[in-house]
């Protein structure tokens, strides 16, 4: 998951609402499995609806659209990377620091040397990938203590993927800027190659812990948003004001596959039926973003990133205490997560975004 705050069409869209929906879908789907809250509902229409719109896929789709828009409107690649960095890293730094501190005070972290650990921590922050930090430095975790062998997060891999999207996209868009048709073809070919790679992982049942957290096997989802933004002037009529049509199509397909193995959309397997359903979901997301826009409904309070960052820390804390399977966890988990997300927004994310706005304005005034 990667947060975005640039909006096309003068901010007249529902992307903030959709990111919040995606974050909540991820939180509730994890509560369903990890806290065993959904066990009585497995195989029901509630299961089919919840898992028919995977939040991670929605994040990637929205990110493809908005990050492409951000790059196109940026004065330079450096400006683009500064904006992205100020949106991603401040909240990520605090989130990882909180988790590491929680592990340290509960016996799950063994700091054998300050410099060695600082190197590890730096790699962890810059990549959002604990597995990469461990590989390039050392293993500081005891796999014991309050949290046991569990990673208090476990969701940051999507940010690692998102960061590789940010590194890949400028190269593709520079080709598109110079040669429109060739650039679009390159994006499409890259998307096809990404889908083939994901299919290879699925068919061979092989999981590469390093390649799997890059743009490689998931760029095909991100590219749907990229191509939609590049050709929005041509395709917008397919989506704007067509929310009911796209929703009806999505629900009809969900009903058709209900009760089968295809009811659960997996972005990791990328089977043809999953790819088709994600393409339909992309249409639904783009239509929902540009139908009946309510840009001020959230009053410019974007909690989606914080919910994504902290929901698993709250969940693993509940599991470590021994609270699983209780109906009231449907309340405790979201309330605890939203409280932390609100703090993250007010104390970290919003000030960082104001700094970003100030830096961009200062650069424009100098220019």
Swiss-Prot record:
TM stretches of this protein: 15-37, 46-66, 88-108, 109-129, 155-175, 183-203, 208-228, 245-265, 270-290, 312-332, 335-355
Sample GO molecular function, one term: acyltransferase activity, transferring groups other than amino-acyl groups
InterPro entries xrefs: Acyl_transf_3_dom (IPR002656), Acyltransferase_3 (IPR050879)
Keyword annotations from UniProtKB, A to Z: Acyltransferase, Cell membrane, Membrane, Nodulation, Plasmid, Transferase, Transmembrane, Transmembrane helix
A GO CC term assigned to this protein in UniProt: plasma membrane
Major site of localization recorded for this protein: membrane
Entry superkingdom: Bacteria
Residues in coiled coil: none
GO biological process, one term: lipopolysaccharide biosynthetic process
Protein location: Cell membrane
Pfam families per record: Acyl_transf_3
Topology with respect to the bilayer: Multi-pass membrane protein
Note: NodX probably forms part of a complex with membrane proteins specified by other genes in the nodABCIJX operon.
Function: Not known. NodX allows Rhizobium leguminosarum biovar viciae strain TOM to nodulate Afghanistan peas.
Assigned protein family: Belongs to the acyltransferase 3 family.
Listed name of the protein: Nodulation protein 10
Source species: Rhizobium leguminosarum bv. viciae
């Amino acid at each position: 998951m990667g947060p975005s705050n640039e909006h096309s069409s003068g901010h007249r869209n529902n992307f903030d609402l959709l990111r919040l929906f995606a974050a909540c879908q991820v939180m509730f789907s994890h509560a369903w499995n990890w806290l065993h809250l959904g066990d009585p509902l497995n195989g029901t229409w509630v299961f089919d609806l919840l898992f028919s719109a995977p939040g991670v896929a929605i994040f990637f789709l929205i990110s493809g659209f908005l990050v492409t828009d951000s790059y196109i409107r940026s004065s330079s690649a450096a400006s683009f990377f500064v904006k992205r960095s100020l949106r991603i890293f401040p909240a990520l730094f605090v989130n990882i620091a909180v988790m590491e501190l929680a592990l340290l005070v509960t016996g799950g972290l063994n700091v054998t040397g300050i410099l060695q650990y600082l190197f590890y921590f730096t790699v962890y922050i810059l990549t959002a990938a604990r597995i990469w930090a461990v590989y390039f430095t050392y293993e500081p975790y005891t796999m014991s203590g309050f949290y046991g062998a569990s990673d208090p997060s476990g969701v940051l891999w999507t940010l690692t993927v998102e960061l590789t999207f940010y590194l890949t996209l400028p190269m593709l868009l520079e080709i598109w800027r110079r040669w429109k048709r060739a650039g679009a073809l390159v994006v499409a070919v890259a998307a096809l190659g990404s889908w083939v790679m994901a299919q290879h992982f699925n068919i061979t049942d092989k999981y590469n812990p390093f390649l799997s957290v890059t743009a490689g096997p998931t760029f095909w989802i991100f590219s749907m948003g990229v191509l939609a933004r590049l050709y929005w002037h041509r395709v917008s009529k397919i989506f704007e004001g067509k929310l009911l049509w796209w929703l009806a199509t999505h629900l009809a397909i969900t009903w058709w596959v209900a009760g089968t193995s295809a009811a659960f959309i997996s972005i990791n397997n990328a089977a043809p039926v999953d790819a088709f359903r994600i393409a339909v979901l992309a249409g639904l997301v783009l239509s929902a973003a540009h139908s009946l826009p309510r840009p001020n409904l959230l009053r410019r309070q974007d909690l989606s990133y914080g919910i994504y960052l902290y929901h698993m820390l709250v969940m693993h804390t509940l599991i470590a205490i021994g609270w699983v399977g209780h109906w009231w966890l449907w309340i405790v988990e979201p309330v605890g997560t939203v409280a932390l997300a609100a703090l993250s927004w007010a104390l970290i994310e919003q000030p960082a975004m104001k700094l970003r706005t100030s830096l961009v304005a200062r650069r424009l005034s100098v220019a």
